[in-house]
Amino acid sequence: MNIKELKDKITDYANIVGEQEGVEIVNVEIYPGGKGLTLRIFIDKEGGVTIKDCENFSRAIEAILDVEDPIKSSYTLEVSSPGIDRPLKNKKDFLRNIGRDVKITTKEKIADNTFFIGKIVDVGDDWVRIEIQETKIKGSKKKGKTELLFIPFNKIIKAQVYLG
């Protein structure tokens, strides 16, 4: 089994455990480590992930991996939160962060800008609405009025929670 097939199989197991444990699987990574493979699984849930969530998920996924034995070599399992600075990629990510400040870069200009910092106020099927606090064009700062702006998901290059 190649790494991609292994990752797909482990992602399937992780999704089953995630559903049982009430967490969402954000990402599964597999890469060569010092002694065998390192398997890193990032989990999240509304309100954030606790250490106890990571422990419970880790125990449950280990039980499945021990029985199913998809990894034939030794491996290290790491389970953690994706962190506050992870990219926002889909509707669920934006919904989870309603009320938070975000920075968004778009592939084409919207309201004469491609970079926005604002608070998520609403999320639709294919858009996010933010209350703009500041806009930036190619490195130069320009203070803008507070306004609501709809940004289609398909126009977003990068989005993440803004801590500034």
UniProtKB/Swiss-Prot annotation:
Q: What is its main location?
A: cytoplasm
Summarizing the function annotation, the protein's role is: Required for maturation of 30S ribosomal subunits.
Q: Which SUPFAM superfamilies match?
A: YhbC-like, C-terminal domain, YhbC-like, N-terminal domain
Family in the record: Belongs to the RimP family.
Provide the protein's localization. Answer: Cytoplasm
Keyword Cytoplasm among UniProt keywords: yes
Where, if anywhere, are coiled coils annotated? none
Give the taxonomic lineage as stored in the record.
Answer: Bacteria, Pseudomonadati, Nitrospirota, Thermodesulfovibrionia, Thermodesulfovibrionales
In terms of CDD domains, this protein maps to: YlxS_C
Q: What GO CC annotations are associated with the protein?
A: cytosol
Q: Name one GO biological process term.
A: translation
What is the native source organism of this protein? Thermodesulfovibrio yellowstonii (strain ATCC 51303 / DSM 11347 / YP87)
Q: Which UniProt keywords apply?
A: Cytoplasm, Ribosome biogenesis
Q: Which domain of life is it from?
A: Bacteria
Kindly provide the name given to this protein in its UniProt entry: Ribosome maturation factor RimP
One Pfam match, by short name?
DUF150_C
